Each structure stands twice: as C-alpha cells, then as structure tokens.
Amino acid sequence: YFDRMLLLNLLGSYRMNIALFPPLLGVLGMIAAFVVYLLVMRYPDGEDKVKKIGDQIHAGALAFMKTEYKYLTVFIILLVFLSQVFLGTETAIAVVVGAACSSLAGFIGMYAATKANVRTATAAQKDGGAAALSVSFYGGSVMGLCVASLGLIGLG
C-alpha cells in the first residue's frame, strides 16, 4: 500500500511539472523571437531614400493597426460579455487572454515585418535574391515564433 501511494504521489508531482513545460517553452520562444528580431535589425537598412520610404510604410502600418485594434476592441468586449453570460467566467477570461495574446502577436509581427521590409529590399539590391530571402524569412519568423509562443503561454 505504501509503495503504491508513494508511486502515485511521485506521478502526481511529475504531472504537475509537465504542466509547466508549455508556458516555459512559450517564454523561451518569445526570447528566441526577440533574438531573431535583433538579428534582422543588424542588417543594413539602406540609403536615406529607402529609409524614408520604409519609415513611412512602418508609420502607416502602425496607424492601420491602431485603427484596427479600436474596432476589434469593441467586438472583443461584446464577445467577452456574451461569453460571460452564456458560457461562464472561465470562458470569458479565456477570450480576453486569447484576444490579448493574438493582438500582441499581431503587433509584434507587423512591427518586425515592416522593419524587415526595408532591409530585405536593401539586401536584394546589394547581395541578390538569396540574401533578400534570408532577411525576409527571419523577419517573418518573428511573427511565427510569437504566435506559437504566446499560444504555449496561454496553455499555462
């Protein structure tokens, strides 16, 4: 009897430790996304004219995101209210956390992508298509890492 109880206690502790893996891996993924972003930012961003156009694209994208998030906030508030009324508090909290993580991933992805665009154009101009593909791949991977990592954090 004692051996079985000890084994069950050990297994229970083991399961609790396994439950920590998804959020822990999510945090590691966010760190990896930040490192990849820093690597992308090390690529040259071109001459003054290219920088100016890139800055305008970046500003326009962020203005678009700001407007989009205003409209989404209204929808999310409505969805949270309906979730609370019909499905309960836990579901409403899950909707809030999911919407926040999705919004954060979208913002980080848009920010990184618009910064990578000008570097991709500069790499294509100076070093050719292979270099441009490399820069654009890393720029896009920031978004992918954020989506996957925030999803893992949300499982915690």
Give each language-model segment a name.
Residues 1-15:
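Short, Lys/Arg-enriched N-terminal segments with co-localized hydrophobic residues
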Residues 16-156:
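Hydrophobic, small-residue-rich transmembrane alpha-helices and their short perimembrane loops
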